[in-house]
A protein has these predicted regions:
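Extracytoplasmic cell-surface/polysaccharide-interacting catalytic and binding patches
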Residues: 1-96, 100-197
């Protein structure tokens, strides 16, 4: 749902909202873009460098990376983690919230190692990372092999039940702009997650 057409209708509303030609509502608040109420960060819509999560479990200024994730996300994750544990599986958050400045250093390192073209297929440029929203995380090993593990298979089949989607699904590179990442989950709530599944 995040790379929708952005053609605005000619009769834009005065409250900062626009309707796209496909009927989606785009709103900008404090420099961040929301489409139909969902905060968006992708190759089309960047977050300002000053953006911090709106509903962090722990204030960003007091938190380490993973603890400044959204409160609702963490509640859903803990339930998903408990259900996975009951099935003998071990899932954990390996990487959560990332500040704009951290993404600058991460992206620059990838560019230095692999070049800009390659880095752009697997890493977000600063401001374009969903990690800055506090609404996504990477699980376990953050490697392609995760999809073949029992945990990866279970996540693929069940994460939507808890309000998560695999944000960069297999075969959708042209749509998302990123290669498949079985470990990268985005919290969107159960209703939208089920539709996306």
């Amino acid at each position: 749902t995040e790379n929708k057409s952005t053609e605005a209708a000619t009769d834009n509303a005065s409250d900062g909202k626009e309707k796209t030609s496909k009927g989606f509502t785009i709103e900008t608040r404090n420099g961040a873009t929301y489409i139909d109420g969902y905060l968006i960060a992708n190759k089309t819509y960047a977050l300002p460098s000053t953006f911090i999560p709106e509903n962090p479990e722990v204030p960003v200024t007091e938190a380490r990376s993973n603890t400044s994730l959204d409160k609702d996300l963490m509640t859903a994750f803990r339930k998903m983690q408990a259900d996975a544990t009951a099935k003998g599986l071990n899932i954990y958050i390996a990487s959560g919230y990332r500040s704009y400045d951290y993404q600058v250093s991460l992206y620059n390192r990838y560019v230095a190692n692999d070049g800009k073209t390659a880095a752009d297929t697997y890493s977000s440029r600063p401001g374009n990372s969903e990690h800055q929203t506090g609404l996504c995380f990477d699980l376990n090993s953050i490697e392609d092999s995760f999809q073949y593990t029992n945990e990866g298979k279970w996540i693929n089949d069940n994460c939507y039940k808890y309000g998560f989607c695999i944000r960069f699904p297999k075969g959708k590179d042209a749509y998302t702009g990123y290669q498949y990442e079985s470990w990268h989950l985005r919290y969107v709530g159960e209703e939208l997650a089920e539709k996306l599944y």
